[in-house]
Regions:
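Bacterial signal peptide processing site
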Residues: 14-17
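Repeated scaffold domains used in trafficking and secretory/extracellular systems
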Residues: 24-30, 62-76, 102-119, 149-165, ...
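A short beta-strand motif characteristic of beta-propeller blades
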Residues: 52-61, 92-105, 139-152, 188-195, ...
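Blade-level signature of beta-propeller repeat domains, shared across WD40, Kelch, NHL, RCC1
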Residues: 356-391
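Short beta-strand elements that form the blades of beta-propeller/WD-repeat-like
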Residues: 33-42, 69-87, 113-132, 160-175, ...
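Acidic, serine/threonine- and glycine-rich low-complexity intrinsically disordered segments
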Residues: 175-295
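Long, acidic/polar, low-complexity amphipathic helices and coiled-coil-like
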Residues: 93-214
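C-terminal motif of bacterial Sec signal peptides marking the signal peptidase cleavage site
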Residues: 9-12
Length: 391
């Protein structure tokens, strides 16, 4: 087992990077302003939009299905491909042209991307290996930055995170299932472990570096060396699968599913996990509104903003456990057959939420201080995953 301080792979090592096959690009004549960008995936390609106008800045060929995650530096996006994690430079905050770079962090079944404490952490489901690098190094390095590699034990769909003091948290599982997490110090020694989290999935870090992992029957909370299991009110199945966090709030908003046999991806309740009091509560969505894992984001005042099947963005205050406002944005929609299928999502930067509407190939910008739609655009592609990128 490699300690976190050990450098396992260097940027100069040619084995750590590949060249994306047949990646072609198109840039537009739209005048570029130095501001935020929106990166959008669609079948067979990637699109970069000017966040202020929602006009196309650049377009790139890619694979039929890719996932997008912020790299954490306010400029780059990690594109999950069959080769690994490919770096898309959106040029956010500059007047440069976006570039789908040849920089690829190779990974078998590339999975979760976590950003915390100046580190970006990549997880390979096919090996359970974890790759860690300084987030800022993406902008200062031509090609792969220096990385730390933590070998996995048994392959599973998992996630890892590194805290600011070097403490390493990672999920535990194998081909038969996932059971919990373990925590290691900087020497690689296991200092805490919990195997009472069936189907462990999703990770979020709240205020004071308290970390939450979702379980099929509740959640695990790691706080300063101790792991606490929080039971869901519905047993034996009450699944928290994704954590939506603000690092300035002790309250984590999670998704929630109480029927293991329910088909599709639509959900009708959220959870509030108080990392200070170590409690978990379930709150029902407003009547007539459901959502998916793609439809939740934290925003102004540490509130959660949820795009519902009724077409409205619902504002949820985790402090009061109440929905406080509803902003109509798009038409009503139905849940996807498969979770990968294109369906509405939300991404927030500052006071602006971006909402996709695949049924109309649309994307909309919403002023969260007023609820007004400020800009709308109809694309010539159907948006799937997307992220708003700001410097």
């Amino acid at each position: 087992m490699l300690a976190l301080g050990a450098v396992a792979t260097l940027a100069a090592c040619s084995s750590g990077t590949t060249t994306a096959a047949d990646s072609t690009s198109t840039t537009t004549s739209v005048a570029r302003e130095a501001g935020p960008r929106v990166a959008v995936s669609y079948e067979g390609g990637l699109r970069v939009l000017d966040a202020a106008t929602l006009e196309t800045v650049a377009d790139f060929d890619s694979e039929d299905y890719t996932r997008l995650n912020l790299a954490g530096d306010g400029r780059n996006v990690m594109v999950t491909t069959s080769q690994g994690f490919q770096v898309l430079d959106t040029a956010a905050g500059t007047t440069d042209e976006p570039v789908l770079t040849d920089t690829v962090f190779e990974a078998q079944k590339a999975g979760h991307v976590v950003r915390h404490g100046g580190k970006t952490v990549l997880y390979a489901d096919g090996t359970s290996d974890t790759t860690i690098f300084d987030t800022a190094a993406l902008e200062s390095t031509d090609g792969l930055p220096e990385v730390e590699s933590i070998p996995g034990v048994e392959a599973h769909h998992g996630v890892s995170i590194v805290l600011e003091d070097g403490t390493f948290l990672t999920t535990v599982g194998n081909a038969n299932g996932r059971t919990g997490i373990e925590v290691r110090d900087t020497s690689g020694a296991v200092i805490a472990r919990n195997d009472q989290c069936p189907g462990v999935h999703g990770e979020g870090t709240a205020q004071n570096e308290v970390v939450v992992f979702g379980c099929e029957n509740g959640a695990l909370v790691y706080d300063k060396g101790e792991i606490t299991k929080l039971d869901a009110p519905d047993q034996p199945y009450g699944r928290v699968g994704n954590a939506y966090v603000s690092e300035t709030s002790p309250l984590i908003v999670g998704d929630y599913k109480d029927d293991a046999d329910a088909e599709g991806s639509l959900l009708h309740a959220v959870t509030v996990i108080d990392t200070a009091t170590k409690t978990l509560e379930v709150v029902q969505m407003p009547e007539g509104a459901e959502y998916t894992w793609r439809g939740v984001s934290r925003g102004p005042d540490d509130k959660a903003y949820i795009i519902g099947t009724d077409g409205a963005v619902h504002v949820f205050d985790p402090t009061t456990r109440e929905f406080t406002a509803s902003y109509p944005v798009i038409g009503e929609w139905e849940g996807p057959t498969e979770y990968q299928d294109a369906h509405p999502g939300i991404s927030i930067t500052g006071d602006t939420a971006y909402v996709t509407e695949p049924d109309t190939d649309g994307i909309h910008a919403v002023d969260l201080t007023t609820g007004d739609v400020t800009v709308s655009s109809t694309l010539d592609i159907t948006p799937n995953e997307f992220v708003a990128v700001t410097d």
